[in-house]
């Protein structure tokens, strides 16, 4: 459970319209890239020069037209905008409203970008004529600083309206000094072009990677410093709700204000007409004695309100709720996850993951610890298992599984994809089988992140892979190997399930004498019979024989004329009924079968007999009381993994009845 108002796991960009990375020394760049940088700079400089010849109203209209052209020719960004709008506004947002807001957003964005190139050429008087102030007393008191009492002010900015105006209004806050924290561009000439105009207005610029001490000094001296707060902050951010969905959020504004004793207020720029904007300033946000997480959450709440007031103005084409790569599970994020006290995990928008189940019972059972780890990976996670219908009852037994989608027998990949689509939106698909079919199912369903093993047969349909670990640890158990791969996605260690309470009443021992894989995994049937007789002479036992319909003759032969109490359920139980029966056993004596793995996951003590397979890799793993007993007679040719022994079956025949009887008796003595 998440503790409200607390971090629940261990763990800024500034204004600018050119989305490049951090500055790199020209000497470290290849000549071709240097040439491209130079050409981009010259092209941008020419564009800026041309735009500044135009009236600002023409820039605004031309920008709207260009924005609508981009809206028309880039459907991917339209989809991203609508996706973000659905997150923010939820089911109340109709498709028509989403389309209208998206179209208006592209028009506003184009207009504001072109105007941001024109604004540095305006005089102070011309710029003032284009601006008005909402909550002007807040602007005067906390940004201009009339009521700041010598304290600095951190202006929490966002990509809202014409956000570049924030870097052009230093003259409006005089005599206070003004600055902004920014992320330097990789292209040094472009970086200089962007910052030249800001500095011409008297705004000091601080590279967030190198010059934060300068920003802190300005604040301590009573200045005002702008910091962007609304971009995806990656591993540097705190994961907290924005419109109820977890997003990585920069704590820089809050920490800078608290560290320097500065005031903190939000400033946004709304578009209200033809080349006209309103600057909105919030009242100061309390910081003294509060956690950085709580202060940052307040900024998110204020941003939500601004977006609701002017939805077309926010930067919807930014992937604000970006899915991290490769660690989309958040147990190891640097700054942790934070939920305010008024929000519970049930209030969060779900992060939906679809896991394609293995097709075999044993493999599915060995995947259960990994499903527990995935579920613990983030508080908003909703875990759905896509399972063959025959295994659906198993997954419904697992508390960490929220939903099960059954694959009807003989369903085509396209039909399964349709089933997935009808179930709703999924953020991630994780494929446990290595089959091409499983990859086709989720690819056809349009799930954006599709993950499987590096050796997956449908790897070309995946966009993230997990590296197997068995080549580094050849003796790694299959369940541990899968857990090691799941950890590559950011999963924590799985929780240990609660201990099973042994059933009271008559002593019921299960017998599973078959193995669908083949006779090489079956201890001789007559020896099972001898063990049953030996134990029955010592204790009163109800023997229950379990197995598949194909093994019904084995059950009949084993039960025939048995002198004690025996129930033959071979081929007579559904998986649900088998689970119920297993829960009533004090012990299961079995070959290496899916039923063995099922008993293991249910916490039923097991005496397991291995022959052609390797117990180190696929034996029972759960901790039970009494502990599991694994019996095998090691010979030079096992494990061979053959379905039938081509020689003398020595690995099974040399495992004696006395050895197995002793193991059962010892296990029962620990579980009276």
Model-found features: residue ranges?
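Low-acidity, Ser/Thr- and Arg-rich intrinsically disordered low-complexity segments
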Residues: 6-15, 25-28
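Membrane-anchoring hydrophobic helices of lipid-metabolizing enzymes
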Residues: 33-157, 192, 196, 202, ...
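Short terminal hydrophobic/aromatic SLiMs and anchors at protein ends
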Residues: 1-2
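Catalytic core of membrane glycerolipid acyltransferases/transacylases, capturing the structured
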Residues: 151-209, 235-238, 386, 392
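Aromatic (phenylalanine/tyrosine) cluster motif
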Residues: 18-20
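Catalytic machinery of carbohydrate-active enzymes
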Residues: 5, 44, 75-78, 106, ...
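Compositionally biased, intrinsically disordered low-complexity segments enriched in Pro/Arg/Gln/His
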Residues: 26-33, 672
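Non-catalytic C-terminal accessory region of glycerolipid acyltransferases
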Residues: 73, 100-103, 147-148, 172, ...
């Amino acid at each position: 459970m998440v503790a409200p108002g607390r971090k629940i796991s261990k763990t800024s960009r500034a204004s600018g319209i050119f989305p490049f990375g951090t500055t790199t020394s020209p000497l470290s760049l290849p000549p071709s890239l240097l040439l491209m940088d130079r050409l981009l700079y010259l092209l941008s400089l020419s564009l800026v020069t041309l735009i500044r010849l135009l009236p600002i109203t023409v820039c605004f209209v031309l920008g709207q037209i260009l924005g609508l052209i981009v809206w028309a020719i880039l459907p991917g960004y339209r989809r991203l905008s609508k996706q973000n709008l659905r997150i923010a506004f939820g089911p109340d947002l109709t498709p028509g409203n989403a389309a209208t807001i998206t179209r208006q957003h592209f028009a506003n964005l184009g207009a504001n970008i072109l105007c941001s190139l024109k604004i540095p050429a305006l005089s102070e008087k011309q710029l003032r004529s284009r601006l008005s102030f909402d909550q002007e007393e807040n602007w005067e008191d906390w940004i201009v600083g009339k009521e700041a009492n010598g304290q600095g002010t951190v202006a929490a900015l966002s990509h809202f309206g014409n956000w570049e105006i924030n870097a052009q209004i230093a003259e409006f806050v005089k005599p206070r000094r003004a600055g902004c924290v920014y992320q330097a561009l990789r292209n040094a000439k472009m970086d200089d072009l962007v910052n030249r105009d800001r500095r011409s207005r008297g705004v000091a610029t601080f590279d967030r990677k190198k010059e934060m001490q300068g920003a802190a000094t300005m604040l301590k001296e009573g200045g005002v410093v702008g910091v962007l707060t609304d971009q995806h902050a990656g591993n540097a951010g705190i994961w907290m709700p924005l419109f109820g969905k977890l997003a990585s959020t920069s704590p820089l504004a809050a920490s800078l204000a608290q560290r320097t004793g500065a005031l903190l207020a939000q400033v946004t720029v709304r578009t209200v007409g033809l080349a006209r904007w309103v600057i909105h300033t919030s009242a100061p946000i309390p910081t003294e004695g509060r956690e950085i997480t709580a202060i940052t959450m307040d900024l998110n709440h204020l941003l939500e309100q601004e977006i609701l007031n002017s939805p077309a103005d926010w930067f919807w084409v930014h992937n604000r709720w970006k899915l991290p790569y490769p660690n989309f599970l958040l147990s190891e994020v640097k700054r942790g996850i934070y939920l305010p006290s008024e929000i519970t995990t049930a209030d969060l928008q779900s992060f939906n993951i679809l896991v394609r189940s293995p097709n075999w019972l044993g493999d599915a059972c060995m995947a259960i610890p990994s499903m527990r780890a995935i579920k613990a990976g983030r508080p908003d996670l909703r875990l759905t298992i896509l399972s063959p219908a025959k295994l659906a009852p198993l997954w419904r037994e697992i508390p960490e599984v929220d939903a099960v989608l059954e694959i009807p027998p003989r369903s085509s990949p396209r039909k399964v994809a349709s089933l997935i689509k009808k179930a709703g939106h999924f953020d991630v698909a994780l494929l446990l089988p290595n089959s091409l079919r499983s990859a086709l199912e989720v690819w056809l369903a349009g799930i954006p992140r599709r993950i499987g093993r590096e050796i997956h047969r449908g790897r070309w349909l995946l966009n993230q892979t997990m590296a197997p670990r068995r080549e580094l640890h050849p003796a790694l158990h299959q369940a541990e190997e899968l857990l090691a791969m799941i950890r590559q996605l950011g999963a924590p260690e799985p929780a240990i399930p609660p201990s099973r309470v042994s059933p009271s009443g008559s002593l019921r021992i299960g017998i599973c004498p078959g193995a669908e894989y083949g006779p090489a995994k079956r201890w001789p049937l007559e020896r099972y019979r001898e063990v049953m007789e030996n134990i029955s002479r010592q204790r009163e036992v109800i023997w229950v024989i379990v197995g598949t319909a194909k093994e019904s003759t084995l059950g009949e032969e084993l039960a025939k004329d048995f002198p004690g109490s025996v129930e033959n359920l071979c081929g007579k139980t559904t998986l649900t009924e088998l689970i119920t029966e297993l829960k009533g056993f004090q012990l299961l004596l079995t070959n290496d079968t899916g039923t063995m793995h099922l008993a293991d996951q249910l916490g039923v003590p097991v005496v397991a007999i291995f022959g052609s397979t390797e117990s180190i890799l696929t034996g029972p793993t759960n901790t039970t009381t009494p502990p599991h007993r694994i019996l095998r007679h090691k010979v030079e040719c096992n494990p061979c993994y053959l379905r039938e022994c081509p020689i003398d079956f020595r690995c099974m025949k040399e495992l004696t009845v006395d050895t197995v009887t002793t193991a059962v008796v010892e296990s029962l003595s620990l579980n009276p």
